[in-house]
């Protein structure tokens, strides 16, 4: 096992040499290099560690340079405080995992997620830094864009409420509306799962899959995505888009990745911890909700700065979401039901009225809270239709209520609005068609 040792000058060199010998014996490690992370207290001039030594201005840079020079399978950390702390170690872990190497310490081991290659056609993945960052909305937007441009996409959707066996929905042929979703609900399906949302709103072929659990680096504990990927490979489509779930990453190799993060998130959560790993393996960052009040003043600039510290070359596109009904609402009195925070509901309602000619007489942002949603619906005035996202309780509460009351239920998507987004996504799709050459970025 080709191994990079991480060492520092706070340890007496003979102690480090003895530790390296023991690691080689116990782990079957073959030392190919050492990265010197800093510290001078116990190191003399010209100390010899018996391996090529890589040093830099800071610990993270030393590890990055060593990983670039030497192809290793494991990074063994023999350093400690005060040379490296928790933040530095998470950055080092991200670098190691992105290079395909295990990161091993005295009481921990992180391994890179296992990504399986499914041959057959070009592929993209849309992954996220957490739940409710708009990842599935970006996936749907990407699918529609690719469809318009003649790429003939299929989406493999991974969700916590997906089916026990991968299920194919031909969004273009099926009328995936309220009646269809209610029937799916009666069969015991999670009818607001992401794959129903994508099929209904984007009208592309969608393969629904499930996953449970998510590791620090995004690997699901259990999933049937690999089976879904094989099904997608056999479909009459031209490109496959894999939709992640929360911060979990589809366990398949892809040609290009889009990372979706929310500007409302803590910058440390996006660019620190193993958010840095997600930045390192991605080719484009879409920074959603990049407006006040979701993002406080200066937050977008701070996030971009933090991202640049990890990936200076990664394109970053700030974006906002705006609702788009998939049915005609002009002249209607509607109740708008969403997962959006209360602070932006008035703005979104105004967008619907101005852009689509409806009158929004009631709003609720409690789509993910069934009890509060029920209270909101009870207190609403009479409407012509419920306008709802396909999320959370959209089917079992809102759609069912509409059916019981004899009111129309019209589904609503959220489009990312951002300068340069279409061009960046299409460049990634074309690059995926050429195959991954080893160079990242667009």
From Swiss-Prot:
The keyword Protein biosynthesis does not apply. It catalyses: (2R)-2,3-bisphosphoglycerate + ATP + H(+) = cyclic (2R)-2,3-bisphosphoglycerate + ADP + phosphate. One of its GO terms (biological process) is gluconeogenesis. It comes from the Bacteria. Keywords: ATP-binding, Cytoplasm, Ligase, Nucleotide-binding. It is found in: Cytoplasm. Its EC number is 6.5.1.9. InterPro entries: Cyc_diphosphoglycerate_synth. The keyword Nucleotide-binding applies. One of its GO terms (molecular function) is cyclic 2,3-diphosphoglycerate synthetase activity. One of its GO terms (cellular component) is cytoplasm. Its main location: cytoplasm. HAMAP family: Cyc_PG_syn. Belongs to the cyclic 2,3-diphosphoglycerate synthetase family. Catalyzes the formation of cyclic 2,3-diphosphoglycerate (cDPG) by formation of an intramolecular phosphoanhydride bond at the expense of ATP. This is Cyclic 2,3-diphosphoglycerate synthetase. It comes from Rubrobacter xylanophilus (strain DSM 9941 / JCM 11954 / NBRC 16129 / PRD-1). The gene is cpgS.
């Amino acid at each position: 096992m080709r191994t990079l040792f991480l060492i520092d000058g706070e340890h007496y060199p003979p102690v480090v040499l003895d530790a390296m010998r023991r690691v080689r014996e116990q782990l079957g490690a073959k030392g190919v290099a050492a990265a010197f992370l800093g510290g001078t207290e116990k190191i003399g001039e010209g100390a010899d560690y018996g391996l090529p030594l890589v040093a830099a201005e800071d610990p993270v840079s030393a590890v990055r340079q060593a990983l670039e020079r030497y192809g290793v399978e494991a990074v063994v950390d023999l350093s400690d405080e005060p040379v490296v702390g928790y933040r530095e170690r998470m950055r080092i872990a991200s670098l190691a995992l992105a290079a395909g190497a295990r990161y091993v310490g005295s009481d921990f081991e992180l391994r890179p997620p296992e990504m399986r290659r499914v041959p057959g056609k070009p592929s993209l993945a849309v992954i996220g830094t957490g739940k409710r960052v708009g990842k599935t909305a970006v996936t749907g937007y990407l699918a529609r864009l690719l469809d318009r441009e003649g790429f003939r996409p299929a989406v493999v959707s991974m969700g916590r409420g997906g089916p026990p066996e991968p299920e194919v929905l031909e969004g273009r042929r099926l009328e995936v509306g309220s009646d269809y979703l209610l029937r799916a609900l009666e069969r015991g399906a999670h009818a607001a799962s992401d794959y129903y949302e994508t099929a209904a709103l984007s009208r592309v072929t969608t393969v629904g899959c499930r996953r449970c659990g998510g590791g620090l680096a995004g690997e699901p504990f259990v999933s049937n995505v690999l089976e879904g990927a094989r099904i997608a490979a056999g479909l009459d489509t031209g490109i496959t888009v894999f939709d992640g779930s929360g911060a979990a990453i589809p366990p398949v190799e892809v040609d290009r990745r889009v990372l979706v993060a929310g500007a409302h998130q803590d910058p440390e959560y996006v660019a620190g911890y193993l958010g840095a790993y997600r930045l390192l393996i991605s080719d484009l960052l879409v920074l959603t909700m990049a407006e006040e009040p979701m993002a406080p003043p200066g937050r977008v600039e701070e996030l971009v700065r933090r991202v640049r510290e990890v990936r200076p070359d990664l394109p970053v596109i700030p974006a906002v979401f705006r609702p788009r009904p998939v049915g005609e609402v002009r002249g209607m009195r509607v109740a708008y039901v969403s997962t959006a925070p209360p602070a932006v509901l008035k703005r979104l309602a105004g967008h619907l009225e101005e852009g689509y000619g409806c009158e929004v007489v009631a709003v609720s942002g409690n789509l993910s809270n069934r009890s509060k949603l029920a209270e909101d619906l009870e207190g609403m005035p009479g409407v012509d239709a419920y306008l709802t996202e396909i999320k959370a309780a959209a089917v079992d509460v809102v759609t069912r209520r509409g059916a019981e009351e004899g009111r129309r239920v019209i589904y609503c998507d959220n489009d990312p609005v951002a300068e340069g987004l279409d061009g960046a996504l299409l460049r990634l799709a074309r690059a995926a068609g050429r195959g991954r050459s080893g160079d990242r970025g667009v």
